[in-house]
Each structure stands twice: as structure tokens, then as C-alpha cells.
UniProtKB/Swiss-Prot annotation:
Pfam families reported for this sequence: PRA-CH, PRA-PH
Cited Gene3D superfamilies: MazG-like, Phosphoribosyl-AMP cyclohydrolase
The name this protein goes by in its record: Histidine biosynthesis bifunctional protein HisIE
Catalytic activities: 1-(5-phospho-beta-D-ribosyl)-ATP + H2O = 1-(5-phospho-beta-D-ribosyl)-5'-AMP + diphosphate + H(+); 1-(5-phospho-beta-D-ribosyl)-5'-AMP + H2O = 1-(5-phospho-beta-D-ribosyl)-5-[(5-phospho-beta-D-ribosylamino)methylideneamino]imidazole-4-carboxamide
UniProt-annotated location(s): Cytoplasm
PANTHER family according to UniProt: HISTIDINE BIOSYNTHESIS BIFUNCTIONAL PROTEIN, HISTIDINE BIOSYNTHESIS BIFUNCTIONAL PROTEIN HISIE
Enzyme Commission number(s) from the entry: 3.5.4.19, 3.6.1.31
Chief site of localization: cytoplasm
Protein's organism: Xylella fastidiosa (strain Temecula1 / ATCC 700964)
């Protein structure tokens, strides 16, 4: 099964509102790519509105009022899940953004960390699997079925191994990128995600 974030809420009385004078910092994360999108603040009313409307709403410290992200631009954040940290004084919000989150037109208010593109690629492959746009190589792979996709993974694996032995670094990187892409497609064709494979790696590491 694909690792879909579970919708969850937090209970207001369980949170430590006193530490921040009635405000809690809120880290917003893309529910699909897991990229951190922004930091905001919520009071209890903002949290209630967020849970009720399913649109992420903050408390503006400068304007001294509630504001729903994207209320003017339309670039709202659709709530998927809310969790508190171990001290109950910080919230992690998983959301699906409609458009860029940053007011500068960027996906995130923070620069992308190396490796984060894999999450975005996994989400894009999932979108291709759902929507099947024409003239898409990914769509063509899905329509050929699991056997063909698995065959491509095998071919790319062999080419990557050969590049690692007898070719230059650029060739090895190119083949590695092809292998990763086709592996993500294979996982999606089986109803799985890259996150599922990462979960297995994490379990082995413990």
C-alpha cells in the first residue's frame, strides 16, 4: 500500500499554549513530497478554524488577526494531518498546496535540500499514474504493465552496473538517474511508493 498521510487532529487541551503566550509555531510540510513549505503561528482559534475548514489558517502577529493561507492569492494549503511534537508546544501540519506557498512565487519559503527532488518525482509519477496524460513516457510505461516496467528496471540496473565498472562518472550518474526513475515507476505500478521503500531502510537501520 502507498504511504498516504493519515488525516489526524490534535486536541486543544493537550497542547502547551502557555509557553508561547497563546501561540504555537507551526511547521507546514507538503504531504506528498515531505518538503518543508513554511513556518507560521497558530493560536487556539486558528487551530480550530484549520481543523473545521480543512484550510490551514494562522494567527498573524503583525496584523493581530487570523489569516487563511492563500486567502487573497488563492494559493491555499489543504489540510491533511496535524501532529504535535513531544513537548506539545510545536505543531507539524501536513498539507497539499494549491500553487506556490512562498509569496515570492516559490514552492517553499526555504531552499530545497539535496535529495528532496526524489519526493517531488515520486509525487509526479503518482500523478501520471492517476491522470495518464497523452504523449507522456511515464503513461506509456504504466499502460505496458508491471512486467514491462520490471524489465526496464532490470535493463537499467545492468547498464548502471556496467557504467560503474567501465564508464566515466557522468555516464554512471546518468544511468543511476534512469534506474531510480524506473524503480519509482515500478513501485507505483504495484501500488507502493518510494516512501514505503524508505520505511524499510529505516527499520533496518534501527
Amino acid at each position: 500500500m502507498c504511504n498516504e498521510p493519515a488525516t489526524s487532529d490534535v486536541a486543544l487541551p493537550d497542547l502547551d499554549w502557555a509557553k508561547g503566550d497563546g501561540l504555537l509555531p507551526v511547521i507546514v510540510q507538503d504531504a506528498d513530497t515531505l518538503r518543508v513549505l513554511m513556518l507560521g503561528y497558530m493560536n487556539s482559534q486558528a487551530l480550530e478554524v484549520t481543523q473545521r475548514s480543512r484550510l490551514v489558517t494562522f494567527y498573524s502577529r503583525s496584523k493581530q488577526r487570523l489569516w487563511t493561507k492563500g486567502e487573497r492569492s488563492g494559493h491555499v494549503l489543504h489540510l491533511v494531518a496535524i501532529d504535535a511534537d513531544c513537548d506539545a508546544d510545536t505543531l507539524l501540519v501536513q498539507a497539499r498546496p494549491r500553487g506556490p506557498t512562498c509569496h515570492l512565487g516559490r514552492t517553499s519559503c526555504f531552499p530545497a535540500a539535496p535529495g528532496q527532488f526524489l519526493g517531488a518525482l515520486d509525487a509526479l509519477v503518482a500523478e501520471r499514474e492517476r491522470e495518464r496524460p497523452q504523449d507522456s513516457y511515464t503513461t506509456a510505461l504504466f499502460e505496458q504493465g508491471v512486467r514491462r516496467i520490471a524489465q526496464k528496471v532490470g535493463e537499467e540496473g545492468v547498464e548502471t552496473a556496467l557504467a560503474g565498472v567501465v564508464q566515466a562518472d557522468d555516464a554512471l550518474l546518468d544511468e543511476s538517474a534512469d534506474l531510480l526513475y524506473h524503480l519509482i515507476v515500478l513501485l507505483r505500478a504495484r501500488g507502493l511508493s518510494l516512501a514505503d521503500a524508505v520505511t524499510v531502510l529505516e527499520a533496518r537501520h534501527r
